[in-house]
């Protein structure tokens, strides 16, 4: 049958194609409802996943535990199960299952073993299967075990199972003891001890919808990848209540789980990965065989898991590993049925005694990175989402990713609580290692604590090697000198190679491959070191290695190319995470990122959430490295944080004693950008450079540390060399920025920059208590007699050549808040505060200052900057612009604030080698303060304010002039001084320094007892070639022509009023006001005018006049003519306010009266049935009076309450009483007269009222009479006044308290013109009223400023209002509303004008005050209403408007009546 027809071929192939298609299209669903514990046979423990994948429906609490296919552990496990056979769990199936297994095992013992990954036809007989295995032998690559697949027997067994239900059973009865103890060779060289999926099909676990289920996989230890689960296809776990993987181990990768595809874990309430481990077996050099054939029981063959040899031998022999179960002696004493591996080759995992032909691995086969992923290893994306709790604790890996290793992306999102605790790794990523790491939508807590990336302790490694034993699991780390190389795929090791040849070849390949995988990390000196996955320098050099390439140890918690933490709404903590190089000597590793290492960028963004993150006590450290140590908490080229964050007690420390680089970034280390917003706090962080933030770029370009919005606090950080914040460019634009008590060994304890710095205050910026003093550094400090300045800010170009001619810009902008420098100190001896000097800013700096209106930039410490400019003219140097507008078209309207230099706390002699231009605002030199500049130019509209003893001077390095157009001299400081002779205060000085003796120094130097007048302080010598440049000291020829130009106004001010209280002013004298150059060629004074406080209003009064003759003597003097002494400044006062308060008292009594007549005595009351009534009322008054010839403008407001009780003894009589309280406030504005009145009052009033109708007989004979209604009110009031008068121009006030007594009587007679009729309730009345009021103001005396006495006075008024009223009712829905409206003309037939006498006590001056009262003619309008809600309750209210030519009054009454 050499040839067949096409039809026959198709017919023969059709069943196979159909079967394959059916299998591929269907994923098996299996119920997982029972647990398994312990077995030396993978066939009875491991779930083998079919080719098309499987879906496990977990029902109840299911666990897999206590399994190992590691040879030594497998033998021990078999012995333990022989002793306790009832603990073994086997498959639940029909009885023919056990016999089938026995048959399969017998066949495999009689045939050569091998894996057949492509065997699919499960209908073949066992004999055919055996033949197929024999004829398909292929040579496998040593790294194939990661993808090894089950044997055909296993596949056939699994496919023939009638059911996949798992349940616990005892051992099959009748099984021999030998059968129970005999280890099964299937799956002994692979991973996935519990679930093994060698195909592309998906593997998934779902929850049984009928119950909450959990899955626990524990104490499963395998040779291959994935201690508990291995899947070549996608792996997903969904909907479980709990998922726990604990104490699993892999000797390759993925201590608990390993997947060649994606991993998705979602909607699982609780996820726990604990104490899972990846530990490649250590190669034991003393026991390596010398026989190259590799015989000695193995017949020179390699097993199907030879890739385990490659990975394990890539690990350094010094690496620690977990202790295997049982010792070598125990293994040798196991049952004869189990062939032991050669003790000389412990890195081989095969337990077979027969030669095992292996398949050739495809060239593109995937290899897991050995020693990585302590809990999870994922080739594709790993996603954990929608869980309540996720915990990874005490997982470990010898290489990368102590808990999780991902070759691509890791995403942890929508988790309530996420915790990584005490995970360790030997190189990178103590908890997580991936290309991209994203943590998002963490709701409650995000915790990374005690995670570590470290090399093992060198002494423990040596000890373990000498004693031929392994270190403990806590220390097993991979310090091999390379990663897995692609060369392994093309250079397979034949089975004839000995163990020693394996080790040698693997080391060589790893060393050469490390060059291509290296990472470029900048050194602290600006150079670049190539660091990657190469080993530490303690390892011997190998072929192909490059000693200049540094190995990276980093990411104590997280290592990734890009790391993102997003939308954190809870609280995040990174604490006690460490990246540590323990190598005692000879290390060249770079140690980076104690908590987080991001190779390209780190982003922390809370978005709209309210989350915060704390980084505390994270560390990068090394004992001996000559590489770079940086980023105690975070290291990344680019760091962006837009969430509130705290960094506390993080450190970057290098303990080596020689050839070391400066550590940088105690909290954050970067090489490109650091951007923080929404606030941050840095406290007690430590590094050589940038104890809080260190940005050291590879090139000096645009690398920036940027702090925007929010509040920033830098407190008690310690720079072992320089700076809390170290960067080329520093930009701060924050609401609050505080640098407090930071310490450094050299200049710039708060900020050190090498290119540019901008500090803008939106609320407050404070530099206080920062200290430069010798402290213990990790590198050698610069020696020499060097002046230390710039305790807060230091700027110097990172170029030691001295060829740079530009200075570094430093901009200080107080746009929304103040900027202050105080108590920033250099202390040569840390314990001796007596030798301290205080200087805030120094270095080769070009300053610019801007302060908005009302804002201040204050320097309580000196400024000592230097310059790289040279020349004999001031024009050759930089300009310091003060308050220059950013808009060239505007006139400096944006910045009109104050720049202040003060010696209030200590001596302040500032030296700024720049040409100062004061564009706008004020420059203040406080008492005894000196400012030395190259030149000074004051623009129009600006103000120069000098206090006694202050000095404005040029410098001797170049000729420069002082142009002063408007000088203000503050006279506040009082006292005689020996330097000023008989003058009562030390005058300020405009000084010109002679430049003819200039030595040519371009840096600023203060003359002192220790420094010659023409000497220049030497800048701090460089730490290394890129950190500090020695200040250039050019030589310049002598120059002349320095002049003071004094023009315009000299204004004297005494804001506190202290100067003119000096008894020395009690006589005529001359007072020196300003010291000028005595050489008339250096002074030009034109149109000088003396203004300001030259005629004081209190104290020793007199007049100051300018003495023009003294200008020739280099001093401006004033002639003082004494007049008299006044305790108080005289302010003319109208005095009307106190008398005018009578009107407010009268108005509050009138308001009560209006409520009683209009509401309580309303006409409708007399038509009601006789009942008693309780009235509760609210009252309000507003009086406004315009100013006139005899009165001033005044307003009065009052509010109060009234309670009344009345009765009707008869139908026609109402009698009642009321009690009222009013609280009022009056105000009078007289700003043009420099004072304001504000008064308050409260009054108590008692009233009685009554009313009764009667008839007036008109014609007695005809019986005609006129019906009239009589209403009356009598009130007595007590009013208490309390008033304060402010005098803003003299900052004084006085107080007055007095009482008023008042009476008010009103009698109203009303006549009805139209009476109500049936169906018509309208009523028209006319009325006349007599109203008399009397208010008596008692005498009183003011207190405080210049008090006055006021006599008593009385205001009386008799008015006769005449009006017309219209009344009627509206009725509907059983509710009755009675309304009344009236208008009246109210002439005053008698009114007096109150006259009050006053006297000023200090001077005896006095007079009379005539109170302004309303005009005699006024009008009144009234409206009242009563709403009857039933027989018992009535709501009522009334409103009265009263007006005349100057006064408008509004009175309101409203409340409720209860009838009883």
Curated annotation (Swiss-Prot):
Which cysteine pairs are joined by S-S bonds?
none
Bilayer-spanning residue ranges: none
User: Per its UniProt entry, which superkingdom is the organism in?
Assistant: Bacteria
Cite the entry's keywords alphabetically: Cell outer membrane, Cell wall, Membrane, Secreted, Signal, Transmembrane, Transmembrane beta strand
Q: Listed GO cellular component terms?
A: cell outer membrane; extracellular region
Similarity comment: family membership: Belongs to the PMP outer membrane protein family.
Q: What is this protein called?
A: Probable outer membrane protein PmpC
Q: Which organism is it from?
A: Chlamydia muridarum (strain MoPn / Nigg)
């Amino acid at each position: 049958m050499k040839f067949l027809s096409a039809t026959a071929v198709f017919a023969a192939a059709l069943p196979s194609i159909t079967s394959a298609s059916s299998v591929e299209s269907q994923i098996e669903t299996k119920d997982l409802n029972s647990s398994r514990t312990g077995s030396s046979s993978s066939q009875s423990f491991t779930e083998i996943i079919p080719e098309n994948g499987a879906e496990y429906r977990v029902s109840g609490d299911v666990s897999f535990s206590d399994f190992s296919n590691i040879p030594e552990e497998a033998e021990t496990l078999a012995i333990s199960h022989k002793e306790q056979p009832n603990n073994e769990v086997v498959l639940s199936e029909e009885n023919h299952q056990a016999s089938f297994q026995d048959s399969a095992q017998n066949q495999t013992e009689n045939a050569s073993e091998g894996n057949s990954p492509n065997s699919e036809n499960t209908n073949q007989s066992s004999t055919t299967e055996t033949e197929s295995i024999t004829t398909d032998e292929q040579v496998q690559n040593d790294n194939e075990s990661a993808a090894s697949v089950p044997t055909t027997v296993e596949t056939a067994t699994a496919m023939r199972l009638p059911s996949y239900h798992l349940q616990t059973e005892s051992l099959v009865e009748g099984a021999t003891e030998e059968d129970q103890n005999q280890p099964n060779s299937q799956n002994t060289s692979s991973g996935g001890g519990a679930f093994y999926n060698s195909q592309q099909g998906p593997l998934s676990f779902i929850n049984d919808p009928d119950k909450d289920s959990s899955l626990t996989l524990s104490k499963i230890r395998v040779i291959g990848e994935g201690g508990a689960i291995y899947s070549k296809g996608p792996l997903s776990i969904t909907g479980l209540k709990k998922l726990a993987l604990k104490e699993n181990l892999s000797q390759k990768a993925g201590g608990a789980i390993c997947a060649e595809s994606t991993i998705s874990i979602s909607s699982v309430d609780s996820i726990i990965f604990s104490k899972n481990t990846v530990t490649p077996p250590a190669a034991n050099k003393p026991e390596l065989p010398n026989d190259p054939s590799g015989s000695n029981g193995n017949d020179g063959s390699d097993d199907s898991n030879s890739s385990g040899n490659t990975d394990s031998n890539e690990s350094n022999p010094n690496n620690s590993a977990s202790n295997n179960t049982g010792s070598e002696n125990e293994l040798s004493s196991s049952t004869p049925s189990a062939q032991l591996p050669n003790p000389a080759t412990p890195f081989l995992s095969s337990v077979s005694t027969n030669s095992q032909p292996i398949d050739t691995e495809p060239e593109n086969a995937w290899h897991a990175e050995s020693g990585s992923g302590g809990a999870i290893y994922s080739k594709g994306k790993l996603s954990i989402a929608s869980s309540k709790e996720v915990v990874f604790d005490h997982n470990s890996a010898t290489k990368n990713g102590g808990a999780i290793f991902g070759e691509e992306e890791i995403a942890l999102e929508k988790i309530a609580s996420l915790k990584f605790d005490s995970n360790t790794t030997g190189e990178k990523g103590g908890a997580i290692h991936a290309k991209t790491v994203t943590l998002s939508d963490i709701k409650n807590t995000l915790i990374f604590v005690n995670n570590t990336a470290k090399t093992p302790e060198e002494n423990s490694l040596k000890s373990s090697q000498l004693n031929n034993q392994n270190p403990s699991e806590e220390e097993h780390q991979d310090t091999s000198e390379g990663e897995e190389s692609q060369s392994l795929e093309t250079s397979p090791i034949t089975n004839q190679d000995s163990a020693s040849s394996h080790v040698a070849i693997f080391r060589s390949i790893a060393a050469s491959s490390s060059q291509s995988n290296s990472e470029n990390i900048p050194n602290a000196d600006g150079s670049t070191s190539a660091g990657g996955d190469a080993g530490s320098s303690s390892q011997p050099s190998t072929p192909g290695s490059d000693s200049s390439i540094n190995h990276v140890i980093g990411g104590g918690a997280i290592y990734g190319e890009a790391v993102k933490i997003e939308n954190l709404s809870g609280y995040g903590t990174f604490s006690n995470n460490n990246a540590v190089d323990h190598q005692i000597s000879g290390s060249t590793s770079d140690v980076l990122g104690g908590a987080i290492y991001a190779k390209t960028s780190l982003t922390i963004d809370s978005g709209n959430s309210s989350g915060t993150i704390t980084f505390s006590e994270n560390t990068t450290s090394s004992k001996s490295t000559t590489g770079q140590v940086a980023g105690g908490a975070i290291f990344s080229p680019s760091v962006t944080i837009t969430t509130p964050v705290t960094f506390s007690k993080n450190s970057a420390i290098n303990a080596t004693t020689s050839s070391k680089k400066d550590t940088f970034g105690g909290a954050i280390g970067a090489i490109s950008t650091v951007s923080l917003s929404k606030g941050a706090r840095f406290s007690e962080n430590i590094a050589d450079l940038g104890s809080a933030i260190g940005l050291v770029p590879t090139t000096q370009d645009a690398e920036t540390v940027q702090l925007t919005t929010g509040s920033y606090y830098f407190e008690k950080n310690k720079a072992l060399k320089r700076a809390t914040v170290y960067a080329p460019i520093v930009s701060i634009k924050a609401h609050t920025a505080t640098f407090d008590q930071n310490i450094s060994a050299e200049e710039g304890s708060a900020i050190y920059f090498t290119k540019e710095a901008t500090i803008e205050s939106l609320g407050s910026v404070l530099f206080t208590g920062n200290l430069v003093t010798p402290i213990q550094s990790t590198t050698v400090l610069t020696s020499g007699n060097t002046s230390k300045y710039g305790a807060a800010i230091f700027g110097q170009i990172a170029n030691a050549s001295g060829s740079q001619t530009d200075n570094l810009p430093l901009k200080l902008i107080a746009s929304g808040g103040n900027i202050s420098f105080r108590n920033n100190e250099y202390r040569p001896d840390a314990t001796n505060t007596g030798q301290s000097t205080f200087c805030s800013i120094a270095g080769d700096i070009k300053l610019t200052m801007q302060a908005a209106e009302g804002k201040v930039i204050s320097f309580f410490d000196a400024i000592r900057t230097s310059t790289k400019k040279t020349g004999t003219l001031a024009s050759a140097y930089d300009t310091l612009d003060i308050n220059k507008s950013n808009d060239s078209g505007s006139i400096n309207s944006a910045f009109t604030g104050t720049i202040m230099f003060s010696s209030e706390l200590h001596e302040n002699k500032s030296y700024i080698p720049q040409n100062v231009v004061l564009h706008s605002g004020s420059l203040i030199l406080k008492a005894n303060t000196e400012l030395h500049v190259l030149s000074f130019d004051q623009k129009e509209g600006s103000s120069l304010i000098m206090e006694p003893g202050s000095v404005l001077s040029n410098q001797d390095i170049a000729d420069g002039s002082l142009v002063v157009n408007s000088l203000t001299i503050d006279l506040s400081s009082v006292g005689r001084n020996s330097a000023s002779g008989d003058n009562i205060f030390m005058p300020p000085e405009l000084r010109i320094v002679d430049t003819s003796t200039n030595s040519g120094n371009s840096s600023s130097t203060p003359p002192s007892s220790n420094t010659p007048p023409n000497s220049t302080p030497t800048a701090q010598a460089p730490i290394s070639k890129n950190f500090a440049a020695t200040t250039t000291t050019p030589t310049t020829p002598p120059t002349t022509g320095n002049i003071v130009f004094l023009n315009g106004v000299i204004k004297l001010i005494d804001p506190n009023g202290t100067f003119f209280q000096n008894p020395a002013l009690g006589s005529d004298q001359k007072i020196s006001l300003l010291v000028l150059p005595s050489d008339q060629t250096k002074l030009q004074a034109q149109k000088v005018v003396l203004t300001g406080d030259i005629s004081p209003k209190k104290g020793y009064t007199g007049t100051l006049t300018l003495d023009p003759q003294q200008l020739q003597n280099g001093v401006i003097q004033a002639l003082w003519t004494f007049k008299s002494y006044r305790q108080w400044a005289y302010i003319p006062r109208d005095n009307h306010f106190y008398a005018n308060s009578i009107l407010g008292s009268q108005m509050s009594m009138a308001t009560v009266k209006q409520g009683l007549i209009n509401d309580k005595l309303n006409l409708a009351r007399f038509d009601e049935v006789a009942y008693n009534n309780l009235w509760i009322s609210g009252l309000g008054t507003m009086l406004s009076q315009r100013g006139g010839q005899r009165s001033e403008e005044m307003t009065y407001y009052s509010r109060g309450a009234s309670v009344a009780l009345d009765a009707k003894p008869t139908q026609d009589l109402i009698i009642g009483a009321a009690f009222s309280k009013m609280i009022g406030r009056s105000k009078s504005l007289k700003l043009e007269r420099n004072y304001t009145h504000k008064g308050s009052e409260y009054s108590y009033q008692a009233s009685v009222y009554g009313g009764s109708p009667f008839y007036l007989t008109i014609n007695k004979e005809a019986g005609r009479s006129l019906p009239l209604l009589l209403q009356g009110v009598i009130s007595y009031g007590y009013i208490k006044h309390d008033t304060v008068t402010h005098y803003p121009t003299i900052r004084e006030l006085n107080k007055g308290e007095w009482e008023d007594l008042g009476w008010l009587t009103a009698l109203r007679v009303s006549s009805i013109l139209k009476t109500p009729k049936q169906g018509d309730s309208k009523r028209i009345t006319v009325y006349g009223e007599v109203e008399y009021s009397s208010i008596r103001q008692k005498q009183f005396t003011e207190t405080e400023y210049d008090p006055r006495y006021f006599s008593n006075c009385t205001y009386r008024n008799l008015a006769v209002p005449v009006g017309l009223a219209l009344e009627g009712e509206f009725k509907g829905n059983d509710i009755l509303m009675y309304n009344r409206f009236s208008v009246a003309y109210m002439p005053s037939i008698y009114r007096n004008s109150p006259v009050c006498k006053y006297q000023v006590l200090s001077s005896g001056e006095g007079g009379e005050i005539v109170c302004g009262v309303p005009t005699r003619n006024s009008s009144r309008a009234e409206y009242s209403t009563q709403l009857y809600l039933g027989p018992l309750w009535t709501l009522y209210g009334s409103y009265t408007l009263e007006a005349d030519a100057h006064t408008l009054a509004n009175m309101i009454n409203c409340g409720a009546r209860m009838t009883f």
